[in-house]
Amino acid sequence: QACLSVNTSERYKVGERILIQRPSTKEWIQTLKTDHFGGGVTALGWKPNQRDITWERTITQITAKGICLDIPLTTAPDSTYGAGTVAKFQWNGRISQIGIENLSLESSYDTKNPKDENHRWMAIGLENVSDAWVRQVDFKHFAGSVVYVQASARCVTVEDCISTQPISEIGGQRRYTFFTNGQQTLFQRIYAEEGYHDFAVGYCAAGPNAFVQCESKLPYSFSGTVDSWASGVLFDIVNVDGNALRFSNCVKFLFHFAVLVKKFLL
């Protein structure tokens, strides 16, 4: 059971929803050696408070020393690096217990242009939602993400879906086929073809997030974390045919590439 030490546990009750925030302090960033990446470029270095992590949790037990949570945290709130804060919250009107299933979704595009982008980018977006699912949906021709779980979504399952024949340019911010910025999301038994990042976890995604029994066929780039400090990420029985599974601080490499291209063009 995951428990958290707090200064005054008496103010909390079992069943309450809380937000736990872990700060990204200067000391933590320096310990990771991500304050500077060399090459004379300082803009890429992480800055304090730019990579704070916020988790939604439910209190399951009150103890003399603190509170216990329904789901463990994915990065330790270490007192050496500022510990963290806990706040009770309510989200009145938040959508929950909703599903999208048994559909075939197809984006119409200019058939004379195999890299047309003047058509639908996103098929399904999940925002401000809890306890939701997408199941047995067939996607074709979308330029961006066929399922995008945003940071305000939690407890989402995406399963038994297939994405084929995407239509777009080949490059950044395109074909992030199954993409999550949320927490407590599960993608299972997913198939995707010719994406860019077919199975992707975004910037500071709080997690845990899992991809299980998924297959990516002939993608143009890797699957994995596509920005910095996504934590609690699991890829289990995931086959990326023709590319890699990678966990990296992706923004650094993209920025360096852009600088090199600019110098070359000049």
What are these regions (language model features)?
Residues 1, 54-56, 95, 121, ...:
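Surface-exposed or flexible loop/turn and strand-edge residues in extracellular/cell-surface modules
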Residues 80-90, 114-125, 141-145, 170-179, ...:
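Extracellular beta-strand/beta-solenoid scaffold signature
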